């Protein structure tokens, strides 16, 4: 390609592009062709940058090489960059460092900064944090914005220099004020965290917004975070979602994951689970662990995508491989339950232990459950209780409830109803339904606490309204008998119904009693028998015995001594005393 330069000997405009109508530097209208012999090093640098911008890397390398051969620092630096990136030449860190060093020795700020980076990360030279900081410092003295930012990072992290967040903030500020976007972001983070300066979310957001105005993906993402969480500004879900989307479109994985959450939950945008899965997938394929985990949950539950245990296991495994605690836990649950994989409690235990080492209380709780059952390990109440305690002391509500149960029944620890009630209370205070029900029982019967039937009903109701069948049954019983509340047979029957339909055998039994006696519902013996049968099939001895009575007396059809005896025997085998006596009585008659 032919070279032209401005005829003005003072003007250094030079180009391989089509000759413009007017020189952009001096306004001249005449240009002369050149074979290169009349060009100086700075001209070759200009031509090299033009070629690099056009994507003509071979020409760029040749141009920079000519400038560097004349000892030009800018040419040496740009040639070093070509060796660093492998543009127009085979990539070579040692050659890049050699050229950066030559230019840095001439005081070229960009080369000094580049050389510092090579020392910081051990590229072409042995890693040397102190040398990195020293070269960053040389460039920063010339007010190179990138070097100021790099040196600030050193002071932030104590890399090659003593950590000094105040000095870091000073350098970030200089760099940010010069328009260097990464420094704007880092300065915003320091201000948000209150490191090296007073915490000020409004000021932090202002810097993020300045960087976002340059369409910087990370800054856009952080603006989304601030508007979502209300840091330094009133929470604004639609605006947060818009910032996430702008960053997500640039391929920034954390923003893609957050925008997917907005779509899945309808937060700031109309709910669209299908589109959410698409964004989760984009982020997950980039290795974003939170997106991998969220995508696995969607695949497991069939949210926005067809249900697929295979895909769920695959994404859980990817996130678990990156040591995401919740992914390790969920993958462990899959192995414990045999969901999507062959059941393997030993592998589940291994995964739970990895998650527990990362500080996840829920994993400690699952380890406790395996030891409680002796599932994949030798059964050990003391070991189970120890793991429950670790999770409970980390304020994990299910473990607090489990530990309370251990104290109530003296499993792995000495029986202590006061401690049982105390742990139930900690769990119940967090809204954990099972603990609310257990604590309600303590108050109803004065176990470990002062008897308080009204408080018991209050706790039963809290758990029942969360859908816990046992609590619904307990609340039904209190409501039927007027314990801690006014008697209301109709309301009692309704709570029994909910409990029964939730699969709780005692709720089925009590609901059957309602139909048998017309308590809160119209008397209906066939329905009563159906619910007794369902309760009996769930293994409730009282229901088995009651069916024996019904068949013996013919309460809902012809008498059937054989059926009666069969049900009495089942109840007796389950430890029901009246059923045992009934068996003895009937066998004597035979």
Language model regions located:
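Residues immediately within or flanking Cys/His clusters that coordinate Zn2+
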Residues: 3-8, 20
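Short Cys/His-rich micro-motifs in 6-15 aa windows
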Residues: 27-36
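Short helix-capping/linker turns of helical repeat alpha-solenoids
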Residues: 39, 69-72, 85-87, 92, ...
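Hydrophobic face of amphipathic alpha-helices that form TPR/SEL1-like repeat modules
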Residues: 44-52, 78-85, 114-121, 150-157, ...
């Amino acid at each position: 390609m032919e070279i032209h330069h401005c005829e003005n000997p003072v003007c250094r405009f030079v180009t391989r592009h089509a000759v413009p109508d007017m020189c952009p530097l001096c306004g001249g209208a005449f240009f002369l062709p050149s074979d290169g012999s009349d060009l100086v090093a700075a001209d070759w640098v200009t031509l090299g940058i033009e070629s690099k911008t056009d994507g003509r890397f071979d020409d760029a390398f040749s141009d920079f090489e000519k400038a560097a051969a004349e000892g030009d620092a800018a040419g040496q630096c740009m040639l070093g960059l070509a060796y660093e990136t492998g543009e127009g030449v085979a990539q070579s860190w040692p050659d890049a460092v050699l050229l950066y060093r030559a230019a840095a020795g001439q005081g070229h700020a960009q080369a000094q900064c580049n050389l510092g980076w090579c020392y910081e990360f051990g590229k072409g030279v042995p890693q040397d944090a102190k040398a990195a900081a020293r070269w960053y410092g040389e460039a920063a003295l010339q007010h190179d914005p990138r070097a100021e930012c790099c040196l600030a990072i050193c002071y932030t992290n104590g890399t090659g220099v003593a950590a000094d967040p105040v000095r870091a903030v000073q350098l970030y500020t200089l760099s940010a004020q010069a328009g260097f976007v990464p420094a704007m972001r880092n300065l915003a983070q320091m201000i948000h965290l209150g490191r090296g300066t007073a915490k000020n979310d409004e000021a932090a957001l202002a810097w993020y917004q300045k960087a976002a105005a340059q369409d910087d993906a990370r800054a856009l993402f952080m603006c989304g975070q601030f508007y979502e969480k209300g840091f330094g500004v009133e929470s604004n879900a639609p605006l947060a979602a818009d910032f996430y989307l702008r960053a997500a479109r640039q391929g920034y994985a954390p923003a893609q994951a957050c925008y997917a959450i907005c779509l899945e939950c309808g937060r700031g945008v109309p709910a669209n689970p299908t589109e959410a899965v698409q964004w989760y997938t984009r982020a997950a394929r980039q290795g974003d662990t939170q997106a991998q985990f969220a995508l696995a949950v969607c695949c497991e539950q069939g949210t926005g995508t067809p249900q697929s245990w295979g895909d769920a296991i695959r994404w859980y495994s990817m996130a678990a491989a990156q040591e995401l605690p919740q992914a390790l836990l969920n993958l462990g649950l899959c192995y414990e339950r045999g969901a999507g994989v062959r059941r393997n409690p030993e592998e589940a235990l291994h995964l739970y232990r990895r998650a527990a080492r990362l500080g996840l209380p829920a994993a400690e709780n699952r380890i406790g459950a395996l030891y409680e059952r002796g599932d994949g390990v030798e059964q050990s109440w003391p070991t189970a209780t120890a793991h429950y305690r670790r999770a409970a002391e980390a304020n994990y509500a299910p473990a607090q409830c489990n530990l309370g149960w251990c104290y109530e029944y003296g499993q792995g620890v000495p029986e202590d109803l006061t401690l049982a009630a105390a742990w139930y209370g900690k769990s119940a205070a967090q809204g954990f339904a099972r603990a609310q029900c257990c604590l309600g029982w303590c108050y109803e019967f004065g176990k470990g606490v002062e008897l308080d039937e009204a408080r018991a009903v209050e706790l039963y109701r809290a758990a029942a309204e969360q859908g816990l069948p046992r609590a619904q049954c307990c609340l039904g019983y209190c409501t039927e008998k007027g314990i801690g509340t006014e008697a209301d047979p109709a309301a009692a029957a309704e709570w029994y119904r909910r409990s029964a339909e939730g699969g709780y055998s005692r709720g089925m039994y009590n609901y059957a009693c309602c139909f048998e006696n017309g308590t809160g519902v119209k008397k209906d013996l066939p329905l009563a028998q159906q619910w007794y049968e369902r309760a009996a099939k769930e293994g409730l001895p009282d229901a088995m015995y009651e069916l024996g009575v019904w068949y013996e007396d013919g309460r809902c059809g012809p008498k059937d001594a054989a059926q009666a005896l069969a049900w009495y025997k089942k109840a007796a085998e389950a430890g029901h005393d009246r059923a045992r006596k009934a068996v003895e009585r009937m066998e004597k008659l035979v």
